[in-house]
Amino acid sequence: MKYIGAHVSAAGGLANAPARAAEIGATAFALFTKNQRQWRAAPLTPQVIDDFKIACEKYHFSAAQILPHDSYLINLGHPVSEALEKSRDAFLDEMQRCEQLGLTLLNFHPGSHLMQIAQEDCLARIAESINIALAQTEGVTAVIENTAGQGSNLGFEFEQLAAIIDGVEDKSRVGVCIDTCHAFAAGYDLRTPEACEKTFAEFGKIVGFQYLRGMHLNDAKSAFGSRVDRHHSLGEGNIGHDAFRWIMQDARFDGIPLILETINPDIWAEEIAWLKAQQIAEVMA
Protein backbone atom coordinates (compact mmCIF):
# COMPACT_ATOMS: atom_id res chain seq x y z
CA MET A 1 0.00 0.00 0.00
CA LYS A 2 1.23 3.48 -0.89
CA TYR A 3 1.27 6.20 1.79
CA ILE A 4 0.90 9.48 -0.11
CA GLY A 5 0.87 12.99 1.34
CA ALA A 6 2.61 16.34 1.69
CA HIS A 7 4.67 18.42 4.10
CA VAL A 8 1.91 20.18 6.01
CA SER A 9 2.00 23.11 8.41
CA ALA A 10 1.93 22.58 12.16
CA ALA A 11 1.02 26.24 12.77
CA GLY A 12 -1.18 26.67 15.80
CA GLY A 13 -0.06 23.37 17.31
CA LEU A 14 1.32 20.00 16.25
CA ALA A 15 -2.15 18.45 16.56
CA ASN A 16 -3.26 20.52 13.56
CA ALA A 17 -0.91 18.72 11.18
CA PRO A 18 -2.85 15.41 10.93
CA ALA A 19 -6.09 17.32 10.30
CA ARG A 20 -4.47 19.36 7.53
CA ALA A 21 -3.14 16.18 5.95
CA ALA A 22 -6.57 14.53 6.09
CA GLU A 23 -8.17 17.60 4.47
CA ILE A 24 -6.12 17.07 1.30
CA GLY A 25 -6.83 13.34 1.13
CA ALA A 26 -3.37 12.36 2.33
CA THR A 27 -2.46 8.96 3.74
CA ALA A 28 0.95 10.26 4.87
CA PHE A 29 2.42 13.58 5.95
CA ALA A 30 5.60 15.38 6.89
CA LEU A 31 5.97 18.17 9.43
CA PHE A 32 8.43 20.15 11.52
CA THR A 33 8.05 19.35 15.23
CA LYS A 34 9.43 22.82 16.08
CA ASN A 35 10.15 26.12 14.33
CA GLN A 36 12.75 25.03 11.78
CA ARG A 37 14.31 28.52 11.68
CA GLN A 38 15.31 28.36 15.35
CA TRP A 39 17.99 26.30 17.07
CA ARG A 40 16.03 25.57 20.22
CA ALA A 41 12.37 25.26 21.11
CA ALA A 42 10.40 24.95 24.31
CA PRO A 43 10.15 21.33 25.48
CA LEU A 44 7.05 19.44 24.45
CA THR A 45 4.42 19.42 27.18
CA PRO A 46 2.41 16.30 28.06
CA GLN A 47 -0.68 18.09 26.70
CA VAL A 48 0.95 18.81 23.31
CA ILE A 49 2.16 15.21 23.08
CA ASP A 50 -1.26 13.77 23.98
CA ASP A 51 -3.11 16.10 21.60
CA PHE A 52 -0.83 15.11 18.72
CA LYS A 53 -1.21 11.39 19.39
CA ILE A 54 -5.00 11.71 19.67
CA ALA A 55 -5.16 13.64 16.38
CA CYS A 56 -3.03 11.02 14.61
CA GLU A 57 -5.35 8.29 15.87
CA LYS A 58 -8.46 10.27 14.91
CA TYR A 59 -7.26 10.74 11.33
CA HIS A 60 -5.76 7.22 11.06
CA PHE A 61 -2.07 8.08 10.76
CA SER A 62 0.39 5.57 12.19
CA ALA A 63 4.06 6.40 12.80
CA ALA A 64 4.92 4.55 9.56
CA GLN A 65 2.96 7.20 7.63
CA ILE A 66 4.67 10.24 9.18
CA LEU A 67 8.05 11.63 8.10
CA PRO A 68 9.13 14.51 10.36
CA HIS A 69 11.86 16.84 9.06
CA ASP A 70 14.52 18.49 11.21
CA SER A 71 15.69 22.11 11.12
CA TYR A 72 17.53 23.31 8.03
CA LEU A 73 20.03 25.05 10.35
CA ILE A 74 21.60 21.74 11.37
CA ASN A 75 24.87 20.67 9.70
CA LEU A 76 25.99 17.29 11.04
CA GLY A 77 29.23 17.45 9.05
CA HIS A 78 30.26 20.97 10.09
CA PRO A 79 34.03 21.51 9.86
CA VAL A 80 34.20 23.73 12.98
CA SER A 81 34.02 21.91 16.32
CA GLU A 82 31.84 24.44 18.16
CA ALA A 83 29.32 24.66 15.33
CA LEU A 84 29.35 20.87 14.95
CA GLU A 85 28.48 20.45 18.63
CA LYS A 86 25.65 22.96 18.29
CA SER A 87 24.24 20.98 15.36
CA ARG A 88 24.64 17.68 17.18
CA ASP A 89 22.79 19.03 20.23
CA ALA A 90 19.98 20.35 18.03
CA PHE A 91 19.72 17.05 16.13
CA LEU A 92 19.55 15.08 19.38
CA ASP A 93 16.75 17.39 20.53
CA GLU A 94 14.88 16.72 17.26
CA MET A 95 15.30 12.95 17.71
CA GLN A 96 14.09 13.16 21.31
CA ARG A 97 11.04 15.17 20.26
CA CYS A 98 10.15 12.44 17.75
CA GLU A 99 10.62 9.81 20.45
CA GLN A 100 8.28 11.71 22.79
CA LEU A 101 5.64 12.06 20.05
CA GLY A 102 5.71 8.35 19.26
CA LEU A 103 7.27 8.97 15.83
CA THR A 104 9.76 6.50 14.39
CA LEU A 105 11.46 8.46 11.59
CA LEU A 106 13.43 11.72 11.38
CA ASN A 107 14.34 13.02 7.93
CA PHE A 108 17.38 15.31 7.64
CA HIS A 109 19.85 16.77 5.16
CA PRO A 110 23.23 15.13 5.82
CA GLY A 111 25.60 18.10 5.95
CA SER A 112 28.10 20.37 4.22
CA HIS A 113 31.90 20.59 4.30
CA LEU A 114 31.81 24.36 3.58
CA MET A 115 34.99 23.95 1.51
CA GLN A 116 36.98 23.59 4.75
CA ILE A 117 37.48 19.84 5.16
CA ALA A 118 37.74 16.86 2.81
CA GLN A 119 34.55 15.19 1.63
CA GLU A 120 35.52 11.93 3.36
CA ASP A 121 36.08 13.72 6.67
CA CYS A 122 32.69 15.41 6.39
CA LEU A 123 30.93 12.10 5.67
CA ALA A 124 32.65 10.55 8.70
CA ARG A 125 31.49 13.44 10.89
CA ILE A 126 27.92 12.96 9.68
CA ALA A 127 28.02 9.25 10.53
CA GLU A 128 29.46 9.97 13.97
CA SER A 129 26.77 12.62 14.56
CA ILE A 130 24.12 9.99 13.81
CA ASN A 131 25.81 7.51 16.16
CA ILE A 132 25.77 10.07 18.99
CA ALA A 133 22.04 10.71 18.55
CA LEU A 134 21.10 7.04 18.20
CA ALA A 135 22.99 6.18 21.40
CA GLN A 136 20.81 8.59 23.38
CA THR A 137 17.41 7.74 21.89
CA GLU A 138 15.27 4.67 21.23
CA GLY A 139 12.89 3.71 18.46
CA VAL A 140 13.63 6.56 16.04
CA THR A 141 15.39 5.94 12.72
CA ALA A 142 17.69 8.64 11.29
CA VAL A 143 16.60 9.08 7.65
CA ILE A 144 19.24 10.70 5.43
CA GLU A 145 17.89 12.74 2.53
CA ASN A 146 19.79 12.84 -0.74
CA THR A 147 20.67 16.37 -1.83
CA ALA A 148 20.98 18.14 -5.17
CA GLY A 149 24.65 18.79 -4.43
CA GLN A 150 24.18 22.54 -4.35
CA GLY A 151 27.12 24.42 -2.85
CA SER A 152 29.14 22.14 -0.58
CA ASN A 153 26.20 19.93 0.43
CA LEU A 154 27.02 16.23 0.49
CA GLY A 155 24.64 13.31 -0.02
CA PHE A 156 24.06 13.95 -3.73
CA GLU A 157 25.69 10.68 -4.83
CA PHE A 158 24.41 7.26 -3.80
CA GLU A 159 28.00 6.40 -2.87
CA GLN A 160 28.00 9.23 -0.31
CA LEU A 161 24.77 7.95 1.27
CA ALA A 162 26.29 4.46 1.42
CA ALA A 163 29.45 5.83 3.04
CA ILE A 164 27.42 7.51 5.79
CA ILE A 165 25.41 4.33 6.41
CA ASP A 166 28.66 2.34 6.53
CA GLY A 167 29.83 4.54 9.41
CA VAL A 168 26.62 4.12 11.43
CA GLU A 169 26.92 1.46 14.10
CA ASP A 170 23.22 0.52 14.41
CA LYS A 171 22.20 -0.21 10.82
CA SER A 172 18.64 -1.00 11.95
CA ARG A 173 18.10 2.68 12.80
CA VAL A 174 19.46 4.43 9.73
CA GLY A 175 17.67 4.91 6.43
CA VAL A 176 17.39 7.06 3.34
CA CYS A 177 14.77 9.39 1.85
CA ILE A 178 15.11 9.90 -1.90
CA ASP A 179 13.97 13.30 -3.19
CA THR A 180 13.24 12.99 -6.92
CA CYS A 181 14.06 16.64 -7.66
CA HIS A 182 17.38 16.38 -5.82
CA ALA A 183 18.27 13.12 -7.56
CA PHE A 184 17.49 14.57 -10.99
CA ALA A 185 19.48 17.74 -10.30
CA ALA A 186 22.38 15.59 -9.09
CA GLY A 187 22.50 13.69 -12.39
CA TYR A 188 20.23 10.68 -11.86
CA ASP A 189 17.82 10.56 -14.80
CA LEU A 190 14.12 9.94 -14.11
CA ARG A 191 12.50 11.22 -17.30
CA THR A 192 11.41 7.82 -18.65
CA PRO A 193 10.45 4.47 -17.12
CA GLU A 194 13.71 3.06 -18.50
CA ALA A 195 15.69 5.85 -16.84
CA CYS A 196 13.87 5.20 -13.55
CA GLU A 197 14.69 1.49 -13.76
CA LYS A 198 18.37 2.29 -14.30
CA THR A 199 18.58 4.91 -11.54
CA PHE A 200 16.87 2.76 -8.94
CA ALA A 201 18.83 -0.34 -9.96
CA GLU A 202 21.92 1.73 -9.17
CA PHE A 203 20.36 2.81 -5.87
CA GLY A 204 19.58 -0.80 -5.01
CA LYS A 205 23.11 -1.90 -5.78
CA ILE A 206 24.96 0.92 -4.00
CA VAL A 207 22.66 1.78 -1.06
CA GLY A 208 20.03 -0.99 -0.97
CA PHE A 209 16.24 -0.83 -0.91
CA GLN A 210 16.27 -2.14 2.67
CA TYR A 211 17.36 1.37 3.67
CA LEU A 212 14.63 3.24 1.75
CA ARG A 213 12.39 4.71 4.45
CA GLY A 214 10.66 7.54 2.59
CA MET A 215 10.55 9.67 -0.55
CA HIS A 216 9.95 13.28 -1.51
CA LEU A 217 8.01 13.40 -4.76
CA ASN A 218 8.95 16.64 -6.50
CA ASP A 219 9.30 17.66 -10.11
CA ALA A 220 12.29 19.86 -10.95
CA LYS A 221 12.52 23.41 -12.27
CA SER A 222 16.26 22.91 -12.44
CA ALA A 223 18.02 21.24 -15.36
CA PHE A 224 19.25 17.64 -15.32
CA GLY A 225 22.62 17.41 -13.57
CA SER A 226 22.60 21.13 -12.72
CA ARG A 227 23.20 20.60 -8.97
CA VAL A 228 20.53 23.26 -8.38
CA ASP A 229 17.65 22.53 -5.97
CA ARG A 230 14.43 23.99 -7.41
CA HIS A 231 11.18 22.06 -6.92
CA HIS A 232 8.17 22.14 -9.26
CA SER A 233 4.64 20.75 -9.35
CA LEU A 234 4.25 17.19 -10.66
CA GLY A 235 4.41 17.06 -14.45
CA GLU A 236 5.23 20.76 -14.72
CA GLY A 237 9.01 20.47 -14.54
CA ASN A 238 11.87 18.75 -16.32
CA ILE A 239 11.16 15.29 -14.89
CA GLY A 240 7.57 14.96 -16.14
CA HIS A 241 4.74 12.65 -15.11
CA ASP A 242 6.27 9.31 -16.11
CA ALA A 243 8.58 8.99 -13.08
CA PHE A 244 5.77 9.51 -10.59
CA ARG A 245 3.47 7.08 -12.42
CA TRP A 246 6.32 4.54 -12.41
CA ILE A 247 6.89 4.96 -8.66
CA MET A 248 3.17 4.49 -7.95
CA GLN A 249 3.18 1.22 -9.90
CA ASP A 250 6.28 -0.30 -8.25
CA ALA A 251 5.74 -2.30 -5.04
CA ARG A 252 9.24 -1.43 -3.77
CA PHE A 253 7.82 1.97 -2.79
CA ASP A 254 4.95 0.52 -0.72
CA GLY A 255 4.68 1.11 3.01
CA ILE A 256 6.81 4.26 3.24
CA PRO A 257 5.79 7.94 3.35
CA LEU A 258 5.74 9.46 -0.16
CA ILE A 259 5.72 13.19 0.49
CA LEU A 260 5.02 16.11 -1.82
CA GLU A 261 7.11 19.24 -1.37
CA THR A 262 5.88 20.70 -4.63
CA ILE A 263 5.59 24.46 -4.95
CA ASN A 264 1.81 25.00 -4.96
CA PRO A 265 0.05 23.78 -1.79
CA ASP A 266 -3.29 24.76 -3.36
CA ILE A 267 -3.08 21.77 -5.71
CA TRP A 268 -1.68 19.20 -3.29
CA ALA A 269 -5.10 17.54 -3.05
CA GLU A 270 -5.18 17.22 -6.85
CA GLU A 271 -1.63 15.89 -6.97
CA ILE A 272 -2.39 13.32 -4.27
CA ALA A 273 -5.56 12.23 -6.10
CA TRP A 274 -3.59 11.89 -9.34
CA LEU A 275 -0.90 9.79 -7.63
CA LYS A 276 -3.57 7.54 -6.09
CA ALA A 277 -5.18 7.11 -9.51
CA GLN A 278 -1.91 5.84 -10.98
CA GLN A 279 -1.81 3.18 -8.28
CA ILE A 280 -5.39 2.15 -9.04
CA ALA A 281 -4.50 1.92 -12.73
CA GLU A 282 -1.81 -0.61 -11.82
CA VAL A 283 -4.24 -2.73 -9.77
CA MET A 284 -6.82 -2.72 -12.59
CA ALA A 285 -4.17 -3.75 -15.11
UniProtKB/Swiss-Prot annotation:
Cofactor requirement: Zn(2+)
Protein keywords: DNA damage, DNA repair, Endonuclease, Hydrolase, Metal-binding, Nuclease, Zinc
Q: Give the E.C. number(s).
A: 3.1.21.2
UniProt remark on cofactor binding: Binds 3 Zn(2+) ions.
Give the catalytic activity. Endonucleolytic cleavage to 5'-phosphooligonucleotide end-products
Q: Does the keyword Translocase apply?
A: no
Residues binding Zn(2+) 1: 69, 109, 145
- Could you tell me which Gene3D superfamilies the record lists for this protein? Divalent-metal-dependent TIM barrel enzymes
| InterPro entries in UniProt | AP_endonuc_2, AP_endonuc_F2_Zn_BS, Xyl_isomerase-like_sf, Xyl_isomerase-like_TIM-brl
Spell out the molecular function terms from Gene Ontology. deoxyribonuclease IV (phage-T4-induced) activity; DNA binding; DNA-(apurinic or apyrimidinic site) endonuclease activity; phosphoric diester hydrolase activity; zinc ion binding
In terms of Pfam families, this protein maps to: AP_endonuc_2
Q: Does the keyword Amino-acid biosynthesis apply?
A: no
Task: Show the SMART domains listed in the entry.
Answer: AP2Ec (SM00518)
Chain positions recorded as Zn(2+) 3 binding sites: 182, 229, 231
Q: Which residues bind Zn(2+) 2?
A: 145, 179, 216, 261
Q: Name one GO biological process term.
A: base-excision repair
| UniProt function note | Endonuclease IV plays a role in DNA repair. It cleaves phosphodiester bonds at apurinic or apyrimidinic (AP) sites, generating a 3'-hydroxyl group and a 5'-terminal sugar phosphate.
Hey, which family's this protein in?
Answer: Belongs to the AP endonuclease 2 family.
Q: What is this protein called in UniProt? A: Probable endonuclease 4
Which species is this UniProt entry from?
Salmonella paratyphi A (strain AKU_12601)
